[in-house]
């Protein structure tokens, strides 16, 4: 079988069946002896016994069927197996069977294999030779669509005729010209195998002997004329000569295509089936059929390529997308070589002495290059389709081709980069993501991709949307130390965009701009809003144009600053370039977004240190930023603290400036309630004191030190000399005279309400920093505080953000050690507070922020234990108590004189009905009644109040303990003693209640069963009236 991957029909299975039958027929003498033995053995077998009869009946046979086979022997059964086998004796051959077999083979097309009477020895030799020369066919599996499977199923029966015609027609040698190559060795081997074997060995319809260009190899792997490599030194051909060669190659390819088509369609059923699919089939069937034809031999199916490209130009988006998908698969899977295609005139070694096969291949490559460009034009048109799904699919096709094939990479890159400016953010973000993936797949293309993105970002008519997505694509580019040229290009691009947008958004640059007072149609339409029952204009806080513009600019500036900060360490740019753009960066520090200002300050610090510029202006801006009210609510507090710490460490020689920063830090923190930020600033001061220990002098300075003047100053009393004093309103911290003042602001934090702040402040004053840990700003936020009351484990979140190698710092990184503070709020080692065993912990091991939970849960557990004990003691009579309360309340309602002591009737009632009871029982009964009346109304509230007192009494004790300055351990011991006393009191109360219940039961038993008629006399009189 041929090695072509795209054969239209695969008849190997059918050929194997027929050849096996014929081979068995040719080897009849070899099996003669064995068959004779089998016949003798079958003649000696018995007839159908009773077991076989029962089995036949069980399988559905009837008695009549058994009668039909009663007279048959086993020899008769064996005859059915001898259709293609040898007979028992050659002299006893069935002439009728032989004639039928020959007629069948003649109809099928195997008339050349007539059965002839030959000698046994000759037959044995032929059978052995056929076994030796038999070569198993190689079957290759390749992906086919639904139409391919249906084609094989429908034409499996008709393909037998194709095989017969292939055997009938003798192979004629092609009359090639002098410039044609001889036949390939593979074709000769196949021809010899057909002659030697005498069986069907060719399973393909097309005969490669009639084709000039073989179809069973990729067109770019076919060997060319050897003269191609020898024509490098030949003079260039003229335009007329190239055109002649082009026409010769075109004619050769067209002739070979025609031969291929005739070979493929010489079977009328095959041609009819294919034409029916291409005319009446569905679009999916047509595309699948054409794709299979192209896969067989793209060089011999140029018409199929034209048909598939024509499907891409249909108005239906679905058909266009399906056709483009099929074309993309063809381009990526064997149709294109792993190099750029060449035009015919650009082929190396082009001369007038080349053979037709080489010219045809050169022509096909030229044709394929032009066809690929036509497909790109279709992609460009569909990339502007109004449907987002279509644009996304086209974008995927463009980058698939760009990533896997070098052909037309410049135009493909231009198409992909242009989609960054798409009006829909989904398409823009998808284009940005695919560009970053392209840079990872082809690192050598990084510079080319960046150039294309920069070109679209710096267009004069580029809008904000295009520029923003271009910048966020550039700032995600991964750089290396060796790529300083790429980093320099990025830094220059960022600074250019800075200047462009600062000029456009500068408020002082609005010269001669007059706003039009004319309202648009939409504004006029909105004025006539709906009125009526469900009408009314919704009140929305609409942002002004300046607010929207500022918000957009802050996002763009933030992206630009991120890119500069990432590219700055890799860039090699002289300091003069940075000095030109420093004014731009200082303008950004005064923008409306504080986070953008922080990023600008980070960049200015890097530029100042690396270029060794004057840092006075930077420290003035940083000193001023401490008074910015937006710092309290900023999400970049961690970055700001790290920047402040790094800057003050770098300025260790200017002690006066550092001391001014220390004073202002404490002044600002005294007005804040954010505990996390305050602890962060104190940790900054603790670490800064290790580098600049002179700041501790502020703790010992007093105003008295500067009240006394020197003797030299006393002598100059006539001169008006001002004494230097601290002035916190100075713009420049160098001239604030902080060294002339003392750090009295520290008193507010030593006596702070929060224990953590107090701990850090005391550590700074005393210098005992061994137990002071690096603070986490996220632990003191409101969200973290509320999360502590959620009694469940925290959700496991992925620390990695995206697939980029550039990730934010996390707690396990090595770089984390160089960071002053963090704001992660990651508490992997802590579970819910209700799951911890607080009773087993010591008071000394409790953290300051966990004292509340320690007291709460320890008290609650002790209260729950007491409640369980009291419930066990009172469970046996709880139901009786409920029943007695209901009975007693019913009696009180029916006999009000039972509880009314002042009424005379009650006295009579008591004397008559309680004559057996003593006088001491009456006050006891009244006391019981009063107690029941109180217990009925406030039974539940007393239980709740008692529970609350049990749970929360320790907080009152905590307040008393703090007033009396007792330690926590002493208060816990006193609480245990008070709890024991309460237990004794509760036991006494329970025993007293039980005694009262017994008295009540005795009183109820002494009451009469029936009431007297005198008590209801008034009601009886009313009924009689």
UniProtKB/Swiss-Prot annotation:
Residues passing through the membrane, by range: none
Residue numbers carrying Phosphoserine: 62, 73, 80, 275, 710, 874, 878, 977-978, 1024
Ranges of biased composition (kind: Basic and acidic residues): 128-143, 186-197, 718-729
Keywords per UniProt: Acetylation, Nucleus, Phosphoprotein, Ribosome biogenesis
Oligomeric form and interacting partners: Interacts with NOC2. Forms a nucleolar complex with NOC2 that binds to 90S and 66S pre-ribosomes.
Record function comment: Required for 60S ribosomal subunit synthesis.
Name the UniProt record assigns to this protein: Ribosome biogenesis protein MAK21
Species per Swiss-Prot/TrEMBL record: Saccharomyces cerevisiae (strain ATCC 204508 / S288c) (Baker's yeast)
């Amino acid at each position: 079988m041929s090695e072509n991957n795209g054969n239209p029909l695969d008849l190997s299975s059918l050929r194997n069946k027929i050849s096996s039958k014929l081979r068995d027929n040719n080897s009849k003498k070899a099996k003669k002896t064995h068959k004779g033995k089998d016949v003798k053995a079958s003649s000696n077998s018995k007839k159908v016994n009773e077991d076989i009869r029962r089995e036949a009946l069980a399988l559905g046979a009837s008695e009549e069927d058994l009668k039909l086979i009663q007279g048959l022997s086993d020899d008769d059964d064996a005859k059915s197996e001898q259709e293609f086998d040898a007979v028992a004796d050659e002299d006893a051959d069935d002439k009728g069977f032989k004639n039928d077999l020959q007629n069948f083979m003649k109809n099928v097309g195997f008339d050349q294999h007539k059965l002839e009477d030959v000698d046994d020895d000759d037959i044995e030799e032929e059978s052995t030779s056929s076994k030796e020369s038999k070569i198993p066919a190689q079957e290759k599996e390749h992906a086919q669509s639904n139409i391919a499977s249906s084609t094989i199923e429908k034409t499996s029966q008709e393909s037998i005729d194709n095989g017969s015609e292939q055997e009938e027609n003798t192979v004629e040698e092609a009359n090639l010209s002098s410039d044609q190559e001889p036949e390939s060795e593979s074709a000769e081997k196949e021809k010899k195998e057909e002659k030697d074997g005498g069986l069907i060995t060719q399973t393909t319809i097309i005969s490669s002997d009639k084709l000039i260009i073989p179809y069973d190899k990729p067109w770019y792997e076919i060997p060319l004329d050897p003269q191609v490599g020898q024509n490098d030194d030949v003079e260039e051909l003229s335009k007329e000569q190239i055109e002649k060669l082009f026409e010769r190659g075109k004619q050769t390819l067209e002739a070979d295509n025609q031969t291929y088509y005739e070979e493929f369609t010489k079977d009328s059923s095959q041609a009819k089936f294919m034409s029916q699919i291409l005319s009446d089939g569905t679009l999916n069937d047509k595309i699948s059929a054409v794709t299979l034809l192209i896969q067989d031999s793209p060089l011999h199916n140029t018409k199929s390529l034209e048909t598939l490209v024509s499907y891409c130009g249909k108005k239906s988006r679905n058909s266009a997308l399906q056709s483009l998908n099929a074309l993309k698969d063809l381009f990526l899977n064997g149709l294109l070589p792993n190099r750029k295609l060449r035009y015919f005139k650009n082929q190396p070694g082009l001369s007038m002495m080349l053979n037709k096969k080489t010219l045809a291949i050169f022509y096909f490559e030229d044709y394929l290059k032009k066809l690929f460009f036509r497909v790109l034009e279709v992609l460009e048109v569909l990339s502007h389709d109004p449907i987002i799904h279509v644009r996304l699919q086209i974008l995927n096709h463009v980058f698939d081709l760009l990533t896997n094939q070098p052909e037309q990479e410049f135009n493909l890159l231009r198409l992909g980069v242009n989609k960054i400016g798409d009006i829909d953010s989904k398409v823009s973000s998808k284009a940005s993501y695919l560009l970053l993936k392209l840079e990872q797949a082809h690192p050598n293309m990084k510079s080319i991709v960046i150039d294309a993105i920069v070109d679209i970002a710096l267009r004069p008519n580029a809008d904000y949307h295009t520029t923003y997505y271009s910048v966020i694509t550039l700032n995600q580019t991964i750089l290396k130390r060796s790529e300083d040229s790429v980093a320099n290009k990025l830094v220059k691009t960022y600074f250019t965009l800075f200047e462009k947008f600062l000029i456009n958004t500068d408020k002082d640059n609005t010269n001669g701009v007059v706003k039009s007072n004319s309202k648009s149609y939409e504004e006029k339409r909105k004025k006539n809003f709906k009125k009526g029952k469900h009408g009314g204009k919704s009140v929305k806080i609409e942002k002004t144009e300046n607010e929207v513009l500022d918000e957009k600019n802050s996002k763009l500036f933030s992206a630009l600053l991120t890119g500069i900060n990432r590219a700055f360490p890799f860039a090699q740019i002289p300091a003069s370039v940075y000095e030109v753009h420093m004014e731009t960066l200082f303008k950004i520090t005064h923008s409306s977004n504080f986070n953008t200002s922080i990023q600008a300050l980070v960049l200015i610090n890097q530029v100042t240190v690396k270029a060794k510029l004057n840092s006075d202006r930077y420290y003035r801006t940083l000193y001023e930023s401490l008074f910015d009210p937006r710092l309290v609510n900023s999400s970049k507090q961690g970055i700001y603290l790290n920047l402040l710490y790094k800057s003050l460490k770098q300025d260790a020689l200017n002690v006066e400036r550092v001391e001014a920063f220390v004073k202002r830090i404490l002044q600002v923190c005294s007005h804040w309630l954010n505990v996390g930020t305050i602890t962060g600033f104190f940790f900054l001061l603790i670490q800064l004191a290790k580098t600049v220990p002179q700041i501790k002098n502020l703790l010992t300075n007093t105003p008295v030190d500067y009240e006394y003047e020197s003797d030299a100053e006393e002598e100059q009393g006539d001169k008006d000399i001002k004494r230097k004093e601290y002035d916190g309103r100075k713009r420049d911290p160098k001239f604030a005279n902080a060294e002339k003042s003392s750090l009295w602001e520290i008193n507010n934090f030593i006596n702070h309400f929060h224990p953590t702040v107090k701990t850090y402040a005391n550590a700074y004053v005393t210098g005992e920093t061994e137990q002071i840990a690096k603070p986490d700003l996220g632990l003191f936020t409101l969200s973290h505080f509320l999360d502590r009351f959620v009694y469940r484990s925290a959700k496991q979140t992925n620390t990695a953000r995206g697939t980029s190698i550039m990730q934010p710092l996390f707690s396990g990184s090595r770089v984390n050690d160089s960071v002053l503070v963090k704001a992660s709020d990651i508490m992997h080692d802590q579970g819910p507070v209700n799951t911890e065993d607080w009773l087993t912990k010591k008071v000394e091991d409790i953290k300051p922020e966990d004292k509340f939970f320690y007291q709460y849960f320890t008290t609650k557990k002790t209260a729950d234990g007491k409640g369980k004990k009291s419930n066990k003691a009172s469970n046996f009579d709880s139901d009786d108590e409920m029943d007695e309360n209901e009975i007693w309340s019913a009696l009180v309602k029916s006999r009000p004189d039972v509880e009314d002591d002042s009424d005379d009737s009650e006295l009579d009632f008591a004397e008559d009905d309680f004559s057996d009871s003593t006088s001491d029982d009456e006050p006891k009964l009244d006391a019981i009644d009063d107690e029941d009346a109180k217990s009925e109304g406030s039974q539940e509230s007393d239980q709740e109040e008692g529970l609350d007192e049990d749970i929360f009494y320790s907080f009152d004790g905590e307040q008393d303990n703090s007033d009396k300055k007792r330690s926590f351990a002493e208060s816990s011991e006193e609480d245990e003693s008070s709890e024991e006393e309460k237990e004794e009191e509760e036991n006494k109360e329970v025993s007293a209640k039980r005694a009262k219940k017994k008295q009540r039961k005795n009183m109820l038993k002494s009451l009469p069963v029936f009431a007297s008629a005198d008590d209801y006399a008034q009601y009886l009189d009313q009924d009689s009236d």
